[in-house]
């Protein structure tokens, strides 16, 4: 099996999204992270315990630990008549992941985190959702400059 992931930060963000999505479906955090990271890296006899990259674990653990706060922030930026429950699980997960990195990862410039999550959104959602995610996260970045690193 060929590995289509190269362990770049973008690839690890995508794997974090996959793990977070699986957690929402009932998977355990570490098991979901290990599966998302290693499902295409090892097969059969080559199977081994892979060391998870800190960046991946930090994203998955951080989003999981701050989920309520992230959901509240997302809710405050939704248009009137919209609620968090109305969003698809894919969009909610992407918003949580992008917002977490923007808010808590000082080493990642806000615009980089924003652009990266949009690229993941384009792969796992449709163009309308990618634009929606871009708009909501851009609004957050522009409204809270003192709380962000831009």
Curated annotation (Swiss-Prot):
Gene Ontology BP annotations: DNA-templated transcription termination; transcription antitermination
Gene Ontology annotations for the cellular component aspect, listed alphabetically: cytosol
Keywords, comma-separated and alphabetical: RNA-binding, Transcription, Transcription antitermination, Transcription regulation
Gene3D superfamilies: NusB-like
Pfam family, one: NusB
MF terms in GO: RNA binding
UniProt key word Oxidoreductase: no
Keyword Transport attributed: no
Function: Involved in transcription antitermination. Required for transcription of ribosomal RNA (rRNA) genes. Binds specifically to the boxA antiterminator sequence of the ribosomal RNA (rrn) operons.
Family: Belongs to the NusB family.
Protein name: Transcription antitermination protein NusB
Record organism: Streptococcus pyogenes serotype M5 (strain Manfredo)
Gene: nusB
